[in-house]
């Protein structure tokens, strides 16, 4: 796994508010932390996303990537830009960009290729892109999906690895992340911010849902 948290990349994240600290955040996993990676702040700025995706594409030989796959929603943007920069370096042919979607009903929440995209996977070299790796669970689903359709996963390229996700967590696929952050997180019952009465941030993360659930529990 490549880690190169150089000052320029960290500054790009910080300048748009993509790394926020000194607050009390609740993650989608239910764990708490004082730091939050606000990936949505990046997507507001096409120039920043473009530059970051160029860096995400750099480690790969353009002719060796047939299709870039990203999970919805952020992965759609990333797959387009990364494929764009791979195509700029290709001498012939074209790198395609597709995305995987989750089932809409309450039973099927697994990723799937819709819109006929599955036809472009078999026997192809696939690069999977993701914005933030936390547990690797979503990306592992996409890896399994690509393999199910006969594709060969060359690598995973991410904006940020905040969960120390390793190749073994994602089907033994090499990981390249622009930045890697080792964030201290806590279960609710051991969270020092909860114990100190630090207000939960309701603007970022799952703070509002956490507070709503607490209120319901105390009714």
Enumerate the language-model features and the residues they cover.
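Short, glycine/charge-rich flexible loops or terminal/linker lids adjacent to PRPP-binding catalytic cores
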Residues: 80-127, 214-217
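Short glycine-rich phosphate-binding loop at a beta-alpha junction
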Residues: 64-73
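A contiguous pocket-lining binding segment that forms or flanks enzyme active sites
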Residues: 112-155
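Short, well-ordered alpha-helices that flank and scaffold nucleotide-derived cofactor binding pockets
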Residues: 54, 58, 80, 84, ...
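Active-site-facing substrate-recognition patch
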Residues: 1-64, 205-219
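Hydrophobic/aromatic beta-strand patches that form the interior of the parallel beta-sheet core
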Residues: 69, 98, 127, 154-157, ...
